[in-house]
């Protein structure tokens, strides 16, 4: 085993990463730097400092990355109306590039020669983290404990923790019956009962959203203001990116919006069932498509729709830092130059309904041409005859010459 001098660990303070921290110290006899990111997971992160200190850690990094996460990752992704396999809003996928970037930066800052993460050898996160590491620092050493050790179950982790004197709160021991991941964009649930895709998830599982059946009987209207494809104000109040998403999560959760139960194709080859709550993101997606509907040129909109699945797959599979994702981002961002205006949506029992959209500066909707009433000569209907004949020409020729 090659000697490791110092490793930067993505550290939550929970069971898995606490065991990893001790395992790194014992197995590699190396100094460990802990990095804990607040990306809106909704848990107190300062206890991670106390936990790291118990392990004798001298260099501890705890950072509030919520604004950077939404501004530089979530918002750029939503400019593309990004959805993986028709449903998934990529809440887990989009958080990994930022964490990987900060780990590499901290490694460079502290002189560490390795980075480590707590992703298992079965999932997508190991790929997402490590593609990011290598893209940002090609010679970095990566330590993935789940691919090395023999602690293959939660019970074995708990036994190791007890043997090594690793403090784990009883509530952590009992935990949730599901494997969960949360950030400001979503919360996900996997494992246990969900491993049978035919079984409905229990109502008690959902944490962010009320059941649509129990949601308020009165709808709620929201006005969202856009500049260059990003939301800058909600109901007339200017808000930062993280504040926008936080507020939309609260409002969407109140009305039972954003629940999703799906089976997805993982990059590593298997199918996996997951349940997700993305209330704010669901509202953002619907509203963004609405403002684009009146501000984007038709062919630009269609080209974006054609490219979106490829862009979504790049993010899902961990290629955020790849040249092809960056190239697509330039195109996407350029398309948003005129995506300015307002959208009104109605929230009601799990539904997001667009009820209005307007752009005083950039709308391409011309009512004098689109009207069903007298248009005063703005549109000459007779012009359509030649347009139709030219578009039918190839089909007319084929039918005339082939006769079968």
Swiss-Prot record:
L-citrulline binds at residues 88, 93, 124, 128, 179, 188, 264, 276. This is Argininosuccinate synthase. SUPFAM superfamilies: Adenine nucleotide alpha hydrolases-like, Argininosuccinate synthetase, C-terminal domain. It is found in: Cytoplasm. Homotetramer. HAMAP family: Arg_succ_synth_type1. It is an enzyme of class 6 (ligase). Pathway: Amino-acid biosynthesis; L-arginine biosynthesis; L-arginine from L-ornithine and carbamoyl phosphate: step 2/3. Its main location: cytoplasm. Belongs to the argininosuccinate synthase family. Type 1 subfamily. Coiled coil: none annotated.
């Amino acid at each position: 085993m090659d000697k490791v001098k110092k490793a930067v660990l993505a550290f939550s303070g929970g069971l898995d990463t606490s065991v990893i921290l001790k395992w790194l110290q014992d197995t590699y006899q190396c100094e460990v730097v802990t990095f804990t990111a607040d990306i809106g997971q909704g848990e107190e992160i300062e206890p991670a400092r106390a936990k790291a200190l118990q392990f004798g850690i001298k260099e501890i990094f705890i950072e509030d990355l919520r604004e950077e996460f939404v501004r530089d990752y979530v918002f750029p992704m939503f400019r593309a109306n990004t959805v993986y396999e028709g449903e998934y809003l990529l809440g887990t996928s989009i958080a990994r590039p930022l964490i990987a970037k900060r780990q590499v930066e901290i490694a460079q800052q502290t002189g560490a020669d390795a980075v480590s993460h707590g992703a298992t050898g079965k999932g997508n996160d190991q790929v997402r983290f490590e593609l990011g590491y290598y893209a940002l620092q090609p010679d970095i050493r990566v330590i993935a404990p789940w691919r090395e050790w023999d602690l293959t179950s939660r019970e074995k982790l708990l036994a190791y923790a007890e043997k090594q004197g690793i403090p784990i709160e009883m509530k952590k021991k009992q935990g949730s019956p599901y494997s969960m991941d949360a950030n400001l964009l979503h919360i996900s649930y996997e494992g246990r009962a969900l491993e049978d895709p035919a079984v409905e998830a229990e109502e008690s599982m959902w944490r962010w959203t009320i059941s649509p059946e129990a949601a308020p009987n009165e709808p709620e209207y929201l006005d969202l203001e856009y500049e260059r494809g990003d939301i800058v104000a909600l109901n007339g109040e200017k808000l930062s990116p993280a504040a926008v998403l936080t507020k939309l999560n609260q409002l969407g959760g109140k009305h039972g919006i954003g629940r999703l139960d799906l089976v997805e194709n993982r990059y590593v080859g298997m199918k996996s069932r997951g349940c997700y709550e993305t209330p704010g993101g669901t509202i953002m997606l619907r509203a963004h498509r609405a403002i684009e509907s009146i501000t984007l040129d038709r062919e630009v909109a269609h080209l974006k729709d054609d490219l979106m699945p490829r862009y979504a797959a790049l993010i899902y599979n961990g290629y955020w830092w790849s040249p092809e994702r960056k190239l697509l981002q330039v195109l996407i961002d350029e398309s948003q130059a005129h995506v300015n205006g307002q959208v009104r949506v109605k929230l009601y029992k799990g539904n997001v309904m667009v009820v209005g959209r307007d752009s005083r500066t950039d709308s391409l909707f011309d009512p004098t041409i689109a009207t069903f009433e007298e248009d005063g000569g703005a549109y000459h209907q007779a012009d359509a005859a030649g347009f139709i004949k030219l578009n039918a020409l190839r089909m007319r020729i084929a039918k005339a010459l082939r006769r079968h």
